[in-house]
Amino acid sequence: MQLYVVTWRSLCFYLQVRAAMLPRAFRCARRSVARCNHTQASSGRTTSFGFKTVPEEDKESLVKNVFDSVASKYDLMNDATSFGVHRLWKDTFVDSLKPGRRAPMKCIDVAGGTGDIALRILDHAREKYADRETSVQVVDINAQMLAEGQKRFKKTMYHYSEPCSRILVAHVNSPTAPQVSFHEGNAQELSPEQFKDNTYDLYTIAFGIRNCTSIPAVLQEAHRVLKPGATFACLEFSKVGNPLLSA
């Protein structure tokens, strides 16, 4: 299995501004943390949530509360807080993977609710390689984020109205399989009936793995659903250890 992990220097200003734009969501999250702090003693295991440390068992619901609050404004918020730079990062990320080069590819985009990465994958395959068979299954734990993805694809050439799975299917005049579908699911525990072993050529997760409670569980599931020799690709913020690169 090939491994692509694209990391970028942590942008403290970006994160601070982003946090400032979500006061209501984070106030709700802080109240939730306060209400459930008593559970920490029961397990003793903690994990990060933004700039806080919270009990492991509470992180999933806290993340859901935040994204429920910002789903309709998520893409606009990313544009405002990164001055549009997040689009360049995502373009570079997808371009480096060359989806469609070996058509058709079966892809899974996890934590990809609004369809940002899925749309780029399909556009790249079509525009660079005239590939209209590559497909993407978008998975997200948050139904409201998936709903935003539906809205986005309704404005594209990939949309048609016949439903599939739990959310939506879209395609490009294909008589066989649809090119994109949206599914509610947990990256740490993908349904083995729906997401079968050794199925996908490409697994992507962009700015999502930090929101997962157990990264090892996410990686284990990614390994399970990917074909032998397939590609795992993660786009995420990180600190650069090499002082020459971080200067």
Regions found by a protein language model. Give the residues of each.
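Conserved alpha-helix/loop element of class I SAM-dependent methyltransferases that forms part
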Residues: 73, 83-106, 120-124
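Short beta->alpha hinge that forms the Motif I/post-I loop of the SAM-binding pocket
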Residues: 140-141, 214, 237
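Conserved class I S-adenosyl-L-methionine
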Residues: 231-247
